[in-house]
């Protein structure tokens, strides 16, 4: 049986990049959106604008997560680590689709800066993979912890009547917590404090810019 070469994996990652960044009319997902069967709520123009900004940030975060996993899968050494990254990336595709659908329902669209965040995250993921699988898993665990905290803040900022967005973010939060737990169980190492702070600073730059653009 032929094993995949680095070139094979690289071609696969280019295909994944196009699937992530080129917005289809409707993504193919493995799970139904948590908001699928919930009724629409009457929202003011200001509320729609604010919720759209938050969901644009969440969508950009999922683009980054997708890219991080794809970069790590490209350079991961162990087969089961590559498979774990691929499985997590598949769940992030669901998140992408849910965020996109909600943005369109609100009359908005994803961030124009997504290609920048994607490229940076792929590079970070690939470098993490080169540093070793345990370090790579450490990046996953810390990224998912920060995303979980970020989603919790957004849940606090949302109007209580916006049941659709709340349902989406709660399901995403559950998935991210599971990814972090799985990474730790697989042998993730705790990242140095300075690395965590740097990741947090980059995250703030992404969230503040994607809210508006």
Curated annotation (Swiss-Prot):
Fe cation 1 binds at residues 62, 92, 95, 176. Coiled coil: none annotated. InterPro entries: COQ7_proteobact, Ferritin-like, Ferritin-like_SF, Ubq_synth_Coq7. Transmembrane segments: none annotated. The keyword RNA-binding does not apply. Its main location: membrane. GO terms for cellular component: plasma membrane. The keyword Transmembrane does not apply. SUPFAM superfamilies: Ferritin-like. GO terms for biological process: ubiquinone biosynthetic process. It holds the Pfam family COQ7. It is a peripheral membrane protein. Its EC number is 1.14.99.60. It is found in: Cell membrane. Binds 2 iron ions per subunit. Its cofactor is Fe cation. Keywords: Cell membrane, Iron, Membrane, Metal-binding, Monooxygenase, Oxidoreductase, Ubiquinone biosynthesis. Pathway: Cofactor biosynthesis; ubiquinone biosynthesis. One of its GO terms (molecular function) is metal ion binding. Fe cation 2 binds at residues 92, 144, 176, 179. Catalyzes the hydroxylation of 2-nonaprenyl-3-methyl-6-methoxy-1,4-benzoquinol during ubiquinone biosynthesis. Belongs to the COQ7 family. This is 3-demethoxyubiquinol 3-hydroxylase. It comes from Legionella pneumophila subsp. pneumophila (strain Philadelphia 1 / ATCC 33152 / DSM 7513).
